[in-house]
């Protein structure tokens, strides 16, 4: 459910991407909300109180939307390469695959400042690609529970155990700047632990 390619981005390109983001940092939209693992913020009172869909956690992060990127953006260039599309298709064993058409989120930068956190959740898409640009001073560890649910089996009991702190299924992935992560998040519960320090 999770694969990492270390040093996928060359140091020169990594530096350009970091500079690109810093130059537009004032355009980053930061938001806070409480969500359940299914990315919903509304409570369903028809369910039992301890149902996973009724367990909410704080989320705090921000995005530099894709439509704000300059035409010569290094990240935009990478995203639009046919070679990358073919490579990812081969990695996940799905063909054909398509780029996300959303002009705001297709290759957005995800920013987490001090106290930033992404709580336990499932993704709405089958898989995602992430590139680590910069590590925080402390925290920001990617944790995941591989294939804890599947098609036709939500496995609510096991999901609930993780939400209440059980660590038996939890794995950690320590990413370094320049690493590419290919992650199947639709069926794998995952989170990013709280960021500490002044480095976003």
Could you tell me what each predicted segment is?
Residues 1-50, 81-82:
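N-terminal auxiliary "cap/dimerization" subdomain that precedes the catalytic jelly-roll/cupin core
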Residues 3, 10-14, 20-21, 91, ...:
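Localized chelating/binding microdomains
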Residues 10, 125, 138, 197-198:
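Short strand-connecting beta-turns/loops that link adjacent beta-strands
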Residues 25, 189-192:
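Soluble, non-transmembrane catalytic domains of enzymes that act on hydrophobic metabolites at membranes
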Residues 44-91:
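Hydrophobic alpha-helical segments and helix pairs
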Residues 68-76, 85-180, 186-187:
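Catalytic core of non-heme Fe(II) oxygenases with the double-stranded beta-helix
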Residues 192-200:
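Ligand-binding loop in jelly-roll beta-barrel domains
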